[in-house]
Curated annotation (Swiss-Prot):
InterPro entries in alphabetical order: Proline-rich_CW_protein (IPR051308)
Tissue: More abundant in the young nodules than the mature nodules.
Disulfide pattern: none
Consequence of changing residue 68 to K: In strain: cv. Quasifalcata K93
Free-text function comment from the UniProt entry: Involved in the infection process during the plant-rhizobium interaction.
Keyword Acetylation: no
Biased composition (Basic and acidic residues): 46-93
Location in the cell: Secreted, Cell wall
Annotated signal peptide: 1-24
Cellular component terms (Gene Ontology): extracellular region
Keywords tagged on the record: Cell wall, Cell wall biogenesis/degradation, Nodulation, Repeat, Secreted, Signal
Family: Belongs to the plant proline-rich protein superfamily. ENOD12 family.
Name listed for the protein in its UniProt record: Early nodulin-12A
């Protein structure tokens, strides 16, 4: 408990010593600066001419060749699979 009171006392005394020094520097008048001998020369802002940029073009894309739609062909007749021919067409009787 004694160390706690001692630390508070040291803190309070250091605050009393340091704070007025900070206030003293705060309320001082600003340092005197003599005026410049010549007024600054007004120069118009430097403008560079615009740079010509070509219009933006997309890079070429390799597209596959366009195939023409196939010509309509009649459907191929395939022989029936897994089915016996009708008996009328059977010549082996």
């Amino acid at each position: 408990m004694a160390s706690f009171l001692l630390s508070i006392l040291v803190f309070f005394l250091s605050a009393l010593v340091l704070v007025p020094q900070g206030f003293a520097e705060y309320y001082l008048n600003p340092a005197y600066r003599p005026p410049q001998t010549e007024p600054p020369v007004h120069k118009p802002p430097h403008k560079e001419p615009p740079v010509h940029k070509p219009p933006h073009k997309d890079p070429p894309v390799n597209k596959p060749p366009q195939k023409e739609p196939p010509v309509h062909k009649p459907p191929r007749k395939e022989p029936p699979t897994h089915r016996h021919p009708p008996s009328e067409d059977n010549i082996h009787f």
